Amino acid sequence: PAGQEKRYAAEVEVLSARSRAVVREPVETLLVGSSIFRLWSSAATDLRDADLVNHGFGGSRTWELVEYVEELVVDFSPEVVVCYCGSNDVNAGASAAAIARRVEIFMKTVEDALPGVGIVYVAINRAPQKRDRWAIVDEANQRIEKACRKGPNRVFVDVNEGLFDARDSPRTELYLEDGLHFRPAAYREVFGPAVRNAIERVRASSRG
């Protein structure tokens, strides 16, 4: 929002500079979003992409994703952008409509700058820590999924099914003690296969 302090300006500058120094072009897959991605240290292995660029930063919110879209995404001209963001918006009291609106602005900005780009949006997870706000999480995901259907090269991937057990309870063994962030098994068993499949789908649609 206008006037909000740029909490992660320094972190974003360091992140983008570090990537520019080592990234080999063209970038096939770029991850961007909040700490769920920032902490995905095994992403290159789990997604079977040794050259993957991971630009997860801070405890970012969707408006910060829009704020830094040039530095973290557009400047690297990726073929596929994989995004996870929204959890921190929910914690901050944002409405589902506001979260979805900013995600759509982000997607449209990327598409306008990079024609033909594929976008994978990973659903906000229904973390145990957010149990009292699952209704907002669900509504935000529904709105974002609908927005993804508006673009031919957008894929919405819902990881929540894999994060719940047969009794429809969160698989707590996949979470750290904070009930929000994940253990390596969650990335390996749930995020990796689901996101890989989504990337393959969006690549196929991008190729036409």
Predicted region positions:
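N-terminal secretory targeting modules
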Residues: 1-31, 37, 41-48, 150, ...
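Cell-envelope and extracellular/periplasmic
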Residues: 55-58, 80-94, 104, 108-111, ...
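Charged helix-capping and loop-helix junction motifs
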Residues: 96-106, 134-141
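Catalytic His-Asp segment of secreted/periplasmic serine-dependent ester chemistry enzymes
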Residues: 126-208
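Conserved beta-strand scaffold positions in the cores of enzyme catalytic domains, especially
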Residues: 31, 52-54, 156
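Structural beta-sheet core signal
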Residues: 31, 83, 120-122
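Oxyanion-hole/transition-state-stabilizing segment in secreted/luminal serine hydrolases
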Residues: 37-53, 62-100, 124-128
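A short helix->loop->beta-strand "cap" motif at the edges of active sites that frequently abuts
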Residues: 114-118
